Regions:
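Active-site flanking residues adjacent to catalytic metal/cofactor-binding acidic residues
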Residues: 89
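Catalytic cores of Mg2+-dependent Asp-rich isoprenoid enzymes
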Residues: 1, 5-81, 92-224
Length: 224
């Protein structure tokens, strides 16, 4: 577990090294490339997926040796999905602190600079790139759904604890597709009532054969 703690801490340290000077100077600093964005998502969340998978295999379940690597890979992508949602949902708040997790290299492809994301009128220019990252997040969420399918049916609590963040994540992506994320006044998030509804639905789904796969398929982002 110390290894994974170190990875998470290393992500936070890199965060401070990258963005500390920008925050102090009142400027906005962006991650340089998509590879650095992916590395950040791995360090702060993908590594948690590895730790969670390791603990599950040691204490709650078993898989054939040839399936374990696949399980870990999907666990990493599960964590990355949740971190990507945080990044894509919290753009205005991060910008206020001088942090832009949207890679500068990608922004340049659309003739944008990090500062341009401070103006919500630039949403139309930003939308194509933003949709690319929502698509990537959906791919990670699909891996998370496949991860859940690998969990034993008898492990109700384990499945439920994985299903709820995926259901909320799927719904969040759907909301982010249509809202203006650059408008700091338009806070985009899943409501408490929706979360309570998902909690009830997933409990029913766990009791019905095939219910888990159905609810996760029905709930995924289909807005494109």
């Amino acid at each position: 577990s110390d290894v994974y703690k170190r990875q998470i801490v290393s992500g936070q340290v890199l965060d401070l090294e990258r963005f500390g000077p920008a925050n102090e100077g009142g400027e906005i600093s962006a991650l340089p490339t998509g590879a650095e964005m992916d590395d950040y998502a791995y360090r702060v969340a993908g590594s948690v997926g590895v730790f969670w998978s390791k603990m599950s295999l040691e204490h709650l379940m078993s898989l054939p040796p040839d399936k374990e690597e696949e399980f870990f890979v999907k666990g990493i992508r599960f964590g990355k999905a949740l971190q990507m949602i945080n990044i894509l949902r919290d753009i205005p708040e991060d910008l206020r602190f001088g942090r832009c997790y949207i890679p500068e290299k990608d922004l340049k492809r659309f003739n944008l600079k990090p500062d341009d994301l401070m103006d919500d009128k630039n949403i139309d220019a930003f939308r194509p790139l933003y949709d690319e990252y929502l698509d990537l997040t959906n791919e990670h969420l699909e891996a998370a759904v496949e991860y859940i399918a690998m969990l034993p049916d008898k492990q109700f609590r384990l499945k439920a604890s994985c299903m709820l963040p995926v259901l909320i994540g799927q719904r969040t992506v759907t909301l982010l597709r249509t809202g203006n994320i650059l408008n700091s006044e338009e806070r985009i998030k899943v409501t408490r009532d929706e979360i309570k509804s998902y909690a009830r639905k997933l409990l029913r789904a766990l009791l019905i054969p095939g219910g888990v796969a159905r609810i996760l398929k029905k709930n995924k982002d289909n807005t494109k």
